[in-house]
Amino acid sequence: MQLTVKALQGRECSLQVSEDELVSTLKHVVSEKLNVPVRQQRLLFKGKALADGKRLSDYSIGPNSKLNLVVKPLEKVLLEESAAACRLTEAPLPRPPAWQLIAKVLARHFSAADASRVLDQLQRDYERSLSRLTLDDIERLASRFLHPEVTEAVEKGFSK
Protein backbone atom coordinates (compact mmCIF):
# COMPACT_ATOMS: atom_id res chain seq x y z
CA MET A 1 0.00 0.00 0.00
CA GLN A 2 1.06 3.58 -0.60
CA LEU A 3 1.65 5.87 2.44
CA THR A 4 2.65 9.49 2.70
CA VAL A 5 4.82 10.60 5.60
CA LYS A 6 4.91 14.35 6.15
CA ALA A 7 7.31 16.05 8.54
CA LEU A 8 6.08 19.12 10.38
CA GLN A 9 8.78 21.19 8.67
CA GLY A 10 7.09 20.52 5.33
CA ARG A 11 9.19 17.70 3.84
CA GLU A 12 7.31 14.59 2.83
CA CYS A 13 7.81 11.29 1.10
CA SER A 14 5.68 8.54 -0.37
CA LEU A 15 6.40 4.97 0.64
CA GLN A 16 5.30 1.57 -0.57
CA VAL A 17 4.81 -0.69 2.48
CA SER A 18 2.79 -3.67 3.63
CA GLU A 19 -0.02 -3.10 6.12
CA ASP A 20 1.60 -5.83 8.25
CA GLU A 21 4.79 -3.76 8.49
CA LEU A 22 6.08 -2.94 11.95
CA VAL A 23 6.17 0.75 12.87
CA SER A 24 9.87 0.32 13.76
CA THR A 25 10.58 -0.95 10.22
CA LEU A 26 8.67 1.98 8.73
CA LYS A 27 10.82 4.35 10.81
CA HIS A 28 13.97 2.88 9.25
CA VAL A 29 12.56 3.48 5.76
CA VAL A 30 11.59 7.05 6.72
CA SER A 31 15.10 7.53 8.11
CA GLU A 32 16.58 6.67 4.72
CA LYS A 33 14.11 8.80 2.73
CA LEU A 34 14.00 11.93 4.92
CA ASN A 35 17.39 11.62 6.62
CA VAL A 36 15.91 11.74 10.14
CA PRO A 37 17.50 9.37 12.70
CA VAL A 38 15.08 6.69 13.90
CA ARG A 39 15.53 7.62 17.56
CA GLN A 40 14.40 11.19 16.81
CA GLN A 41 11.20 10.12 15.02
CA ARG A 42 7.69 10.07 16.38
CA LEU A 43 5.09 8.96 13.85
CA LEU A 44 1.47 10.03 14.30
CA PHE A 45 -1.70 8.81 12.64
CA LYS A 46 -4.84 10.87 13.26
CA GLY A 47 -3.05 12.52 16.20
CA LYS A 48 -2.09 9.25 17.87
CA ALA A 49 1.56 8.25 18.38
CA LEU A 50 2.50 4.92 16.82
CA ALA A 51 4.36 2.39 19.00
CA ASP A 52 7.44 0.73 17.48
CA GLY A 53 6.37 -2.82 18.34
CA LYS A 54 2.95 -2.57 16.67
CA ARG A 55 1.99 -3.14 13.05
CA LEU A 56 0.43 -0.53 10.79
CA SER A 57 -2.71 -2.69 10.60
CA ASP A 58 -3.08 -2.40 14.40
CA TYR A 59 -3.92 1.27 13.82
CA SER A 60 -6.23 0.64 10.83
CA ILE A 61 -3.79 2.45 8.57
CA GLY A 62 -4.91 1.76 5.03
CA PRO A 63 -3.77 2.63 1.51
CA ASN A 64 -3.11 6.32 0.77
CA SER A 65 -3.05 7.19 4.47
CA LYS A 66 -1.03 10.16 5.62
CA LEU A 67 1.25 9.92 8.66
CA ASN A 68 2.75 12.91 10.41
CA LEU A 69 6.37 12.87 11.49
CA VAL A 70 7.47 14.82 14.54
CA VAL A 71 11.24 15.19 14.80
CA LYS A 72 12.27 15.20 18.45
CA PRO A 73 15.26 17.40 19.35
CA LEU A 74 18.39 15.31 19.99
CA GLU A 75 18.76 16.74 23.52
CA LYS A 76 15.28 15.48 24.45
CA VAL A 77 16.04 12.04 22.99
CA LEU A 78 19.27 11.81 25.00
CA LEU A 79 17.45 12.82 28.20
CA GLU A 80 14.74 10.20 27.57
CA GLU A 81 17.36 7.52 26.91
CA SER A 82 19.33 8.34 30.06
CA ALA A 83 16.12 8.35 32.11
CA ALA A 84 15.21 4.94 30.69
CA ALA A 85 18.68 3.64 31.51
CA CYS A 86 18.29 4.90 35.08
CA ARG A 87 14.96 3.09 35.41
CA LEU A 88 16.62 -0.12 34.24
CA THR A 89 19.35 0.21 36.86
CA GLU A 90 17.00 0.99 39.76
CA ALA A 91 17.02 -2.68 40.73
CA PRO A 92 19.51 -3.21 43.54
CA LEU A 93 22.95 -3.74 42.10
CA PRO A 94 25.47 -6.12 43.64
CA ARG A 95 27.81 -4.29 45.97
CA PRO A 96 31.23 -3.35 44.57
CA PRO A 97 34.16 -5.40 45.92
CA ALA A 98 35.19 -2.69 48.42
CA TRP A 99 31.74 -2.72 50.06
CA GLN A 100 31.75 -6.54 50.05
CA LEU A 101 35.08 -6.51 51.87
CA ILE A 102 33.79 -4.00 54.43
CA ALA A 103 30.68 -6.17 54.89
CA LYS A 104 32.91 -9.18 55.65
CA VAL A 105 34.90 -7.22 58.23
CA LEU A 106 31.72 -5.93 59.88
CA ALA A 107 30.25 -9.45 59.93
CA ARG A 108 33.20 -10.60 62.05
CA HIS A 109 32.52 -7.96 64.70
CA PHE A 110 28.73 -7.52 64.70
CA SER A 111 25.57 -9.57 64.42
CA ALA A 112 24.21 -9.91 60.87
CA ALA A 113 21.47 -7.33 61.49
CA ASP A 114 23.86 -4.83 63.13
CA ALA A 115 26.51 -5.32 60.44
CA SER A 116 23.89 -4.63 57.77
CA ARG A 117 22.71 -1.45 59.53
CA VAL A 118 26.28 -0.21 60.04
CA LEU A 119 27.13 -0.89 56.39
CA ASP A 120 23.97 0.87 55.17
CA GLN A 121 24.75 3.92 57.32
CA LEU A 122 28.37 3.92 56.16
CA GLN A 123 27.23 3.84 52.52
CA ARG A 124 24.74 6.68 53.10
CA ASP A 125 27.45 8.79 54.78
CA TYR A 126 29.86 8.02 51.95
CA GLU A 127 27.30 8.97 49.27
CA ARG A 128 26.43 12.17 51.14
CA SER A 129 30.12 13.10 51.39
CA LEU A 130 30.63 12.46 47.68
CA SER A 131 27.59 14.51 46.73
CA ARG A 132 28.96 17.48 48.69
CA LEU A 133 32.31 17.54 46.90
CA THR A 134 32.87 20.74 44.97
CA LEU A 135 34.81 21.03 41.75
CA ASP A 136 37.65 22.61 43.77
CA ASP A 137 37.69 19.59 46.12
CA ILE A 138 37.88 17.20 43.17
CA GLU A 139 40.63 19.28 41.58
CA ARG A 140 42.64 19.20 44.84
CA LEU A 141 42.22 15.43 45.12
CA ALA A 142 43.27 14.93 41.51
CA SER A 143 46.36 17.11 42.05
CA ARG A 144 47.34 15.07 45.10
CA PHE A 145 47.03 11.83 43.14
CA LEU A 146 48.80 13.14 40.05
CA HIS A 147 51.56 15.07 41.88
CA PRO A 148 52.14 13.41 45.28
CA GLU A 149 55.64 14.94 45.57
CA VAL A 150 54.17 18.48 45.62
CA THR A 151 51.64 17.49 48.27
CA GLU A 152 54.37 15.99 50.48
CA ALA A 153 56.49 19.15 50.17
CA VAL A 154 53.53 21.35 51.12
CA GLU A 155 52.65 19.11 54.08
CA LYS A 156 56.28 19.16 55.31
CA GLY A 157 56.29 22.95 55.04
CA PHE A 158 53.23 23.16 57.32
CA SER A 159 54.64 20.78 59.93
CA LYS A 160 57.76 22.89 60.66
UniProtKB/Swiss-Prot annotation:
Residues of the signal sequence? none
Q: Name one GO molecular function term.
A: protein-folding chaperone binding
Q: Which UniProt keywords apply?
A: Cytoplasm, Isopeptide bond, Nucleus, Transport, Ubl conjugation
Ubiquitin-like domain sequence ranges: 1-76
Q: Which CDD domains match?
A: Ubl_UBL4A_like (cd01807)
Q: Has the keyword Ubl conjugation been applied to this entry?
A: yes
Post-translational modification as stated in the protein's UniProt record: Polyubiquitinated. Ubiquitination by AMFR and deubiquitination by USP13 may regulate the interaction between the BAG6/BAT complex and SGTA and therefore may regulate client proteins fate.
Name-wise, this protein is: Ubiquitin-like protein 4A
Q: Which GO terms describe its biological process?
A: post-translational protein targeting to endoplasmic reticulum membrane; tail-anchored membrane protein insertion into ER membrane
Looking at the keywords, is Nucleus present? Answer: yes
The protein's superkingdom reads Eukaryota
Starting at the broadest rank, the lineage of the source organism is:
Eukaryota, Metazoa, Chordata, Craniata, Vertebrata
